[in-house]
Regions:
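Cap/insert and terminal regions of metallo-dependent hydrolase folds
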Residues: 165-258
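Conserved beta-strand hairpin/beta-sheet module of binuclear metal-dependent hydrolase folds
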Residues: 1-44, 144-161
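Structural motif
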Residues: 29, 50, 131, 154-156, ...
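Active-site metal-binding loops of divalent metal-dependent hydrolases
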Residues: 10-11, 28, 33-35, 56, ...
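Short helix-terminating capping/connector loops at secondary-structure junctions
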Residues: 74-77, 107-113, 216-222
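Active-site metal-binding motif and surrounding structural segment of the metallo-beta-lactamase
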Residues: 37-83, 178-179
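Short amphipathic alpha-helix with an adjacent loop that forms part of the alpha/beta core around
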Residues: 40-45, 126-129, 169-174, 211, ...
Length: 263
């Protein structure tokens, strides 16, 4: 059975037509919960049962409190939020702490909260219906992970935020029928030092990273999608990627809001 992914947001920042990272799988699963979630209707928000987080930076988690506030009272079960220890701990300590936001992991009651938090480990596979979601290792400025989403018909890989990472590609190369790879590139080549220190990629680094992808793991129609472009440099970043990829087999494309991917 195939799976559909709808891109609610994939930018490294905001503007009138840009939203931060939020990917909707089959109407009921979110990967990250950035500002793109705010474009969903109340009925669409109520359908979301699971959120899988890549890390705790604000542009990836900011809509979780608002989902609970908007539709928690009209749902009959908690919103299940998954993440590695550092991500879940950050939510508990810094968001749902009754200072920044009410603790919806205990509201309206500890036994029946609007939100439940669930720990996962890198390498761990979580089954949601017919979909298997595996946390992948990455290298960011804080503890983080990517995801491989296996529908049975194909696999989509999402890097989340990462810099150069051999471990990520080793894990990707263990997947099957990889049809889509969504990977970040946040900075221009002239800002490569900043990209590295902040745990991100530049165009040159991206092209080198893609050389680590083993074709044996890939679907014949593999597509590479670039996300997390900084708003004031996105077009220039894609231009650099296009030039660097002229002689490469893989031709990365810009991921846009409202794109739908099937796998």
């Amino acid at each position: 059975m195939s799976c559909n992914l709808r891109v609610l947001g994939c930018s490294g920042g905001i503007s009138s037509d840009l939203r931060t990272t939020s990917l909707l799988l089959n109407d009921n699963i979110l990967i990250d919960a950035g500002t793109g979630v705010g474009d969903l209707s109340l009925d669409e928000l109520r359908k979301i049962d699971y959120v899988f987080l890549t890390h705790s930076h604000l542009d990836h988690i900011c809509s979780i409190p608002f989902i609970a506030d908007a539709v928690g009272g009209s749902r009959d079960k908690p919103l299940k939020v998954y993440g590695i220890y550092e991500t879940i701990h950050a939510l508990q300590e810094h968001i749902f702490n009754n200072v920044i936001w009410p603790d919806f992991t205990k509201i309206p009651t500890p036994k029946n909260p609007f939100i439940s938090l669930h720990l996962i480990d890198v390498g761990e596979k979580t089954k949601v219906g017919n979909i298997n979601i595996t946390a992948l290792p990455v290298d960011h400025s804080i503890s983080a992970n990517g995801y491989a989403v296996d529908s049975g018909a194909g696999t989509l890989v999402f890097s989340g935020d990462t810099s150069v990472s051999d471990a990520f590609w080793k894990a990707v190369n263990q997947q099957h029928q990889v049809k889509h790879v969504i990977i970040e590139t946040s900075f221009l080549d002239q800002e490569e030092a900043l990209a590295i220190v902040s745990g991100h990629l530049s165009p040159s680094l991206l092209v080198k990273e893609l050389d680590k992808l083993d074709s044996i793991a890939c679907h014949p129609d593999l597509q590479i999608w670039v996300c997390h472009l900084k708003p004031d440099g996105g077009d220039a970043i894609m231009q650099e990627i296009e030039v660097l990829s002229q002689s490469a087999k893989l031709k990365p494309q810009k991921l846009n809001r409202n794109t739908t991917l099937e796998f």
